Amino acid sequence: AQTTAPSVYPLAPGCGDTTSSTVTLGCLVKGYFPEPVTVTWNSGALSSDVHTFPAVLQSGLYTLTSSVTSSTWPSQTVTCNVAHPASSTKVDKKVERRNGGIGHKCPTCPTCHKCPVPELLGGPSVFIFPPKPKDILLISQNAKVTCVVVDVSEEEPDVQFSWFVNNVEVHTAQTQPREEQYNSTFRVVSALPIQHQDWMSGKEFKCKVNNKALPSPIEKTISKPKGLVRKPQVYVMGPPTEQLTEQTVSLTCLTSGFLPNDIGVEWTSNGHIEKNYKNTEPVMDSDGSFFMYSKLNVERSRWDSRAPFVCSVVHEGLHNHHVEKSISRPPGK
């Protein structure tokens, strides 16, 4: 098939003064071949609350979407960055307010207090998410495939879910109470617990959604992607010398050279999970593999006590899908 560059479309809420609200912004990457593309937000500066959905192949071309939650848009610029190595394409699209630009607000009237509900063309939208790497690769965890329905209207709030594994219906999913969103629509989530071996063997999981606002049910399917698997290399680094006079120091874990980009990284100390760490999203390297960083902030007194800190990595390319690298303050330093 011929290499085709993607078209990129920023997606913004319809109207309303959202400067003090949390909003979800999107980026549609459409009509490209072959895989993969990478999507970052503000060149990676926005990494929390980012969801990039699996690509869908239709008529020989791929399409995917990515979303980010922002509490500062539109006063702070949010840009979707898309890279498609196969076509040497790099595209940056700023998410701008629709319906009249930055100064536009909803029409006001004596009896209305909320922004009008946006017209929902075709009714609700459905997205399906794979299990988290840690949950599926460590057999003791509770792995789930998740189906998310958004833009459910107040007039037709009831959503019905049906789940199938290799086209056989199952009845073990758990559906959460619907959540009202900032634009007066609802979000509904259903999660299907799955078995480690079912995911790893490539079984197909299908979520079927029905709602009176839909002309017909929507079906979304997901399975473990096929492709090259390469194990990550893991390196841990202590704080720089200049930081040792401060009250808090930073430890860094670099994970590089891995495929696919599904990976889990966390920090532990004395068997307990550390809370004060941040991970970047996986970034595509020049050879097509991925790398990411994890930074743990700890009190300097804990580092000075020579307590060991462990970077724990979960990836399907690793032996037993898991590796740990430990670091502590060296003697005499």
From Swiss-Prot:
<feature type="disulfide bond">
    <location>
        <begin position="147"/>
        <end position="207"/>
    </location>
</feature>
<dbReference type="InterPro" id="IPR003597">
    <property type="entry name" value="Ig_C1-set"/>
</dbReference>
<dbReference type="GO" id="GO:0003823">
    <property type="term" value="F:antigen binding"/>
</dbReference>
<feature type="domain" description="Ig-like 3">
    <location>
        <begin position="232"/>
        <end position="328"/>
    </location>
</feature>
<feature type="domain" description="Ig-like 1">
    <location>
        <begin position="6"/>
        <end position="96"/>
    </location>
</feature>
<keyword id="KW-0393">Immunoglobulin domain</keyword>
<dbReference type="Pfam" id="PF07654">
    <property type="entry name" value="C1-set"/>
</dbReference>
<dbReference type="InterPro" id="IPR003006">
    <property type="entry name" value="Ig/MHC_CS"/>
</dbReference>
<dbReference type="InterPro" id="IPR036179">
    <property type="entry name" value="Ig-like_dom_sf"/>
</dbReference>
<dbReference type="InterPro" id="IPR050380">
    <property type="entry name" value="Immune_Resp_Modulators"/>
</dbReference>
<feature type="disulfide bond">
    <location>
        <begin position="253"/>
        <end position="311"/>
    </location>
</feature>
<keyword id="KW-1015">Disulfide bond</keyword>
<keyword id="KW-0677">Repeat</keyword>
<dbReference type="GO" id="GO:0019731">
    <property type="term" value="P:antibacterial humoral response"/>
</dbReference>
<protein>
    <recommendedName>
        <fullName>Ig gamma-2B chain C region</fullName>
    </recommendedName>
</protein>
<dbReference type="InterPro" id="IPR007110">
    <property type="entry name" value="Ig-like_dom"/>
</dbReference>
<dbReference type="GO" id="GO:0042571">
    <property type="term" value="C:immunoglobulin complex, circulating"/>
</dbReference>
<feature type="domain" description="Ig-like 2">
    <location>
        <begin position="124"/>
        <end position="223"/>
    </location>
</feature>
<dbReference type="GO" id="GO:0034987">
    <property type="term" value="F:immunoglobulin receptor binding"/>
</dbReference>
<dbReference type="InterPro" id="IPR013783">
    <property type="entry name" value="Ig-like_fold"/>
</dbReference>
<dbReference type="GO" id="GO:0006958">
    <property type="term" value="P:complement activation, classical pathway"/>
</dbReference>
<feature type="disulfide bond">
    <location>
        <begin position="27"/>
        <end position="80"/>
    </location>
</feature>
